[in-house]
Amino acid sequence: TRDVADVGGLILNRENLLNTAYTMDEIAGYITGIAFKLSNIKASTLKSSKLEGDLTELIELVVDEIYKLNEIIRSLNSDSAKSIELAQDTQKLEREIDIKYRKMVLKALEISTTSEMLLMKDTIEGIEEMADKCQEVSDSFILLALSL
């Protein structure tokens, strides 16, 4: 009967699950877009603007956030309280990402070539928007954990 009750909780939240799945699919789309933009930025622009290290750190933070989402999914099945705790960790990462994003946009605006500046700014914004989508997924998992 416990298995039936667990499935019942998921059925009641199927709309939330579907929206979460669509949002996760959007994250994959952001990854593709960011990779395309990064491949078109000249290496000399990255070095001269001193954004290479910052960009690496920003991407690492988002990757950490994605790993946290993976941990949340795994813990939903066994310990919903742990899922909520992990989701709070993603909120901390999101705040770090926002701070780094703002600093990087200001640095990117100093790039002298307009096309390179716009491409860099779009890349940074894409990474930040992907982090926002990760936060949306995390929030959905909190709702799901509370209902289980």
Descriptions of predicted regions:
Residues 1-148:
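Cytosolic, long alpha-helical scaffolding segments
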